[in-house]
């Protein structure tokens, strides 16, 4: 942002979307994120807000406030909503905006001629691999993927099946944040799948502006939340780019300035996520104590893990598709163990953990799209994983006792950050 009358206000809204998007309400009908996106689209091109532009900014603020009022009934108690309302009031005061006046819908920022999407002369710092010329060794890449019921492959090639209902951080480092929201596949079931995905690319030097990407069930956009397809107006903006591979089903995001490739798919009703990222970027965190708070690095909390291998063995022994234990209700009888294995073998001939995940998902959901999710997840591994000898992962040779969760070195305590956020939410509500 430039130094203008609105620099302080716009600085606030550089931070606010990160906070709002990383910690949204769980499966809430509140539409505050839509209001945020509309406001950003209306104001993101205003690098300098002089006095002559203040009326236009006030119009955008009134439209923002009007949007929040329309969704107020469904946002009661929502931290993101109350934070936005409080921020709007502050900006109204700072810019001497009247609450009465035009509230036309925010206009989408149009890209100028010769937009940076066409630039190929990005600075070297905006190309991660080129910047490695000063190092003796090439970067070491890692992979993380989330798909299906959901199944997680971490940056360290640990494979887990998790419940993790609600909003969970997948990645959180100095360059980007990724959060998923998982919802129950069947009413009353502990089996969940990813219904929403938010990716925040943080502003980086002369390369990219902050960009937010959001996908939900039945909505896989081929653009960022502000309508753009690259990193904005900076000289190296072409180092961040979205490409649509299959309309409404498959997009790829290239973030060359951090050597990162992200693949997002919609398979059936649910989303899958896969990323290739340098270890240096994975470990780039300011607070080392909070490094373990995201799933791609440390995996799921112990109490959120499902021992699907024991479940699979139980189904094979009984010869019928039926969950064991009070926390896993009976699924539709669409597949037996034999028919599920036969179906999965059509796409996944190697009986590795992707194959076993496929069988598990068919037995627990009866939805054949979960077979495709496992298949595409493995296809993404083949494209993104740097070690071709580690594409297939297999179950442990040591069997787990029925009812035991998958092993973990340390059970998780409630992260201190979440406790702080809970306290903060109470503070906001007390002020409003």
Swiss-Prot record:
State the species of origin: Gallus gallus
Give UniProt keywords alphabetically. Answer: Autocatalytic cleavage, Cell membrane, Disulfide bond, Glycoprotein, GPI-anchor, Lipoprotein, Membrane, Signal
Tell me the gene name.
RGMA
Which residues of the precursor form the propeptide? 30-149, 405-432
Q: What is its main location?
A: membrane
Role description: Acts as an axon-specific repulsive guidance molecule in the retinotectal system. Repulsive for a subset of axons of the temporal half of the retina. Provides thus positional information for the temporal axons invading the optic tectum in the stratum opticum.
Q: Which GO terms describe its cellular component?
A: plasma membrane; side of membrane
Put simply, this protein is called Repulsive guidance molecule A
Q: Which family does it belong to?
A: Belongs to the repulsive guidance molecule (RGM) family.
Q: Which InterPro entries would you find in this protein's record?
A: RGM (IPR040287), RGM_C (IPR009496), RGM_N (IPR010536)
